[in-house]
């Protein structure tokens, strides 16, 4: 035995140290900062940081999250695998991962003022569209029926969308989908026609929610409609969840069975999603016996193992931070400012003779109809981009093309985070008005050269350097936007 021990000792002593300890280069690879380790990627990040700081961000689904959220998002929680749910994982070593996820769930219920006896929440969905699919699949079988707001009328792809030729959204391949619409004259959801269609179509789920609808949804009316056809009411509050948490607009939770949301828009968290579900009694049978909700297990199973493997623990931890911030007085004031800024922006457009879909806004966004201005949203979006204003083209009721729509969607959450007030948004509208006029002028010049298609227009404009007006506006925006606070 002594001979064997000596043999083993001699064998280990002969192994070069680098076989069981990190070399200097290996340590450097693991510990070097990004700027040193990968200057190419670092340069891209720094360029994007400058772009964000020197731009006016008006995309309604974007925001600037806090330093604390960013710290959690880039933390060691990234390193851990944790398939399953707290207390029931398929991997060991999840004590603190469980703590973070449970904290996130608790804060989610608190942020939206929910009773844990009546509501539960899954915080593992990776993003909004998968969360919607996971919720649908929990309560629907393939080819069951679903209704959502039509995409050209302000809906979202994840609520189902088809053309006469084919299904565009995968949701419309899994399920039979029928859209409901807004009234083209008022821009408000046509609840009467929705009710008639729902009674005939008999959907299993009706989605209340939108990505480009500036008015409040009548959840009470939609609940009444779902009860007529024994459907679930699913509210997708992705855009407005921050406003709902702050209580500055009505909450869908009083009427909905299921509520989904992303976490990075008005909620100002990381890029993730949540699914809230009711618990307890859903209805009563003819004898008065309670019929219970059975959503918790179905939704949890649909998320994992149905559609996902391991959750993104760094995102869940960062979301817990954001939800904690959502309960503060400062967050409440922020959401009030988001609303007042949106109304100021809407009024400024109306004063300048612009047509707004629905005539104004009750939320964080404004949908501008450019039809009367003789130019489309795609061309205006491009010139705005060249002067460091980020917005997005958007369909308005009656549009036939999502690529060259007549609308422009504008939101206030991101710039409000940076400290823009009502007067600042009036100036923003002034800048946009200048861009609309400039775009029309440039497009007319392009048409004279036979460049009628949008791709021809983009080629004609190029990087904008040949147009002095673009250079002037860009310089003005960079100087002005750069003065505002930037959270990271």
Swiss-Prot record:
Which cofactors? pyridoxal 5'-phosphate
Q: In which pathway does it act?
A: One-carbon metabolism; tetrahydrofolate interconversion
List every position bearing N6-(pyridoxal phosphate)lysine. 265
Query: What is the annotated localization of this protein?
Result: Mitochondrion
**Record key words, sorted:** Mitochondrion, One-carbon metabolism, Pyridoxal phosphate, Transferase, Transit peptide
Gene Ontology CC terms: cytoplasm; mitochondrion
Task: Name a Pfam family for this protein.
Answer: SHMT
For molecular function, the Gene Ontology terms on record are: glycine hydroxymethyltransferase activity; pyridoxal phosphate binding
Reported EC number(s) for this entry are 2.1.2.1
Q: Where is the transit peptide?
A: 1-20
Q: Which InterPro entries match?
A: PyrdxlP-dep_Trfase, PyrdxlP-dep_Trfase_major, PyrdxlP-dep_Trfase_small, Ser_HO-MeTrfase, Ser_HO-MeTrfase-like, Ser_HO-MeTrfase_PLP_BS, SHMT-like_dom
For the protein in the UniProt heading, the enzyme class is: transferase
An example GO BP is:
tetrahydrofolate metabolic process
| Catalyses which reaction(s) | (6R)-5,10-methylene-5,6,7,8-tetrahydrofolate + glycine + H2O = (6S)-5,6,7,8-tetrahydrofolate + L-serine
Q: Which residue stretches, if any, does this entry annotate as coiled coil?
A: none
Which NCBIfam families does this UniProt record tie to the protein? PRK00011.1
Q: Give the similarity note.
A: Belongs to the SHMT family.
Quaternary data: Homotetramer.
Main function: Interconversion of serine and glycine.
The entry's protein name is Serine hydroxymethyltransferase, mitochondrial
Q: What is the scientific name of the source organism?
A: Schizosaccharomyces pombe (strain 972 / ATCC 24843) (Fission yeast)
Q: Which gene encodes it?
A: shm2
